[in-house]
């Protein structure tokens, strides 16, 4: 299972989200998922389920991964290795994607909001971890004033086009503290601006901060998880997030690599140092 691990991998217990979606859909069908900024597919893998991790079984969720996009070619190659999909991962720059062309190529039906039943070619869920460099403490923290910091608007473009019932986005914890005084003359944090935007396009939104280290990942990765549910569905979001499993006993890098450690000649692995 080690091949599925990548620096962008997020392990997400989506039981509560799955129950919420199932209640909204009210029919035992597969959910069509559209993935943006997909990387190696860590968030998608958590939604898909069907694997065992730290002696805990994660059941297979009834989803169809209908489309994924990432501009980083190497990551998309790993994505294809991680998932059994019958289509290529789109490597087009998301700023240049023509949604009507996507509909035509993949057979998607946009905006199924007013249909009484679920359309098999509609998009039920959109996932996306829009780029975080401009919000990270490791960067210059230009926030939304940087072009990369406004890529959430591209995710919004997809959401407004397809009107999914649910979307889930993630970003670094720094998004809560990065202020953008020069953008729209609003003195607010990037997260406040983004949450307000998703609310204005018709979604009830909620966020929480989770640290991957608390759930057994041998790395401290605090991430803001944003969940949006389409407001016309008449549902407030009340998700019970999973309790930490490793808050007091974090796993080390050796723990995480233990199952593959003997496959390498460790004398040939160079030491890695991080510099700001």
What is the role of each PLM region?
Residues 77-114:
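S-adenosyl-L-methionine
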